[in-house]
Design a protein with these regions (language model features):
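Alpha/beta enzyme core
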Residues: 34, 83-113, 122-198
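Glycine-rich, positively charged N-terminal anion/phosphate-binding segment
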Residues: 1-5, 20-95
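Hydrophobic faces of well-ordered beta-strands that scaffold small-molecule active sites
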Residues: 15-19, 40-42, 70-74, 97, ...
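N-terminal small/glycine-rich loop or linker at the start of catalytic domains
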Residues: 4-16, 50-70, 103, 108-111, ...
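Active-site beta-loop-alpha junctions enriched in small/polar residues
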Residues: 20, 45-47, 75-77, 102-104, ...
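Alpha/beta catalytic cores of nucleotide-metabolism and tRNA/nucleoside-modifying enzymes
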Residues: 1-3, 11, 15, 21, ...
């Protein structure tokens, strides 16, 4: 099993659940942990939200001791606020603090946060350096290939991040301009890997066990981050671990296992978020879990009417 060390945190394996707003909440992270993910990334949290004691931010900071090691991801652009808020939350049970420099969402970018930071190398250094000095836990950074095709600077930014004291860097092989469209450029991940000595985690288009293996072979990356490829597919982690052990990818889960996992996911949602929110948030997950299954289109038409666990259970009998 290929372990991965990030600062003083030793991961049992090098497969990482990437941070996704509205997706990598506590229930979903627990499912991915059960399937063997080596590191779980939380939904991104606003450093300003912590500063202003935003109640929605507090719910995003929930961590279950069973899911550790877990990475808490901040977004922000003020070195003072980000570093001070990192210090404020340091006693919580997360293992690693990540700084988001990849989010492409317009309102984040307009604030000079997320992927907008890639246009400001000086601020990148100040932000990472201040945060590294403020806390004892390892600090990592998630970046993109660049802001747009005219500004491909992942290698330059990764070097600055390393110089500022970060313990690892994750690289998504798309520009901000691409959002999630087109193809991820794995070549840029290889270039970053050659340019820095801290661990490099590759990200982008890893939708199956085969793709994760191909990324590692093509880029030499130390870890593989799986984000959208894990939506409705927590089994991707157990598949990869099985491949490492045996050299073959196992069969995909059958319909019954998918159904049972959806119901367990729904129970966790209700446990942590209550019936109303838990079931509503479960709807998108059901669409992902059932993609490609016989009868899935009909089920997706009806999922938005589901209001309770019993209704969900009843609906899933049609699969």
């Amino acid at each position: 099993m290929k372990q991965l060390k990030i600062g003083n945190v030793l991961l049992e394996n090098s497969y990482v659940l990437g941070p996704m707003a509205g997706v990598t909440d506590l229930p979903f992270r627990l499912l991915c942990k059960e399937q063997g993910a080596g590191l779980l990334c939380m939904e991104m949290v606003s450093a300003k939200g912590i500063f202003y004691n935003n109640k929605n931010t507090e719910s995003l900071l929930q961590i279950n001791p069973e899911e550790v090691p877990v990475s808490l991801q901040f977004f922000g652009s003020d070195p003072k606020i980000v570093s001070e808020m990192a210090k404020r939350v340091e006693e919580r049970p997360f293992s690693i603090l990540d700084i988001n420099m990849g989010c492409p969402v317009p309102k984040v970018v307009r604030n000079g946060e997320g992927s907008a930071l890639m246009k400001n190398p000086k601020l990148v250094y100040e932000l990472v350096s201040a945060t590294v000095k403020a806390i004892k836990k390892p600090v990592t950074v998630k970046i993109r290939k660049g802001f747009d095709d005219e500004h491909i600077n992942a290698v330059e930014i990764a070097k600055i991040i390393e110089e500022a004291g970060a313990a690892a860097v994750a690289v998504h092989g798309r520009t901000r301009e691409q959002y999630y469209s087109g193809k991820a450029d794995w070549e840029i991940i290889r270039q970053v890997k050659e340019a820095v000595s801290i661990p490099v985690i590759g990200n982008g288009d890893v939708t199956s066990g085969e793709k994760a293996i191909a990324m590692r072979e093509q880029t030499g990356c130390d870890g593989v981050m799986i984000a959208r490829g894990a939506q409705g597919n927590p089994w991707i982690f157990s598949e990869l671990l099985e491949y490492e052990r045996t050299g073959r990818l196992p069969d995909r889960p059958d319909v019954e296992e998918i159904k049972q996992t959806m119901l367990r996911h729904a129970r966790l949602q209700i446990e942590y978020k209550g019936d109303f929110t838990g079931i509503r948030e479960m709807r998108k997950h059901v669409a992902w879990y059932t993609k490609g299954l016989h009868g899935a289109a009909r089920l997706r038409d009806r999922i938005n009417q589901v209001e309770s666990y019993a209704e969900l259970e009843n609906l899933l009998t049609s699969l």
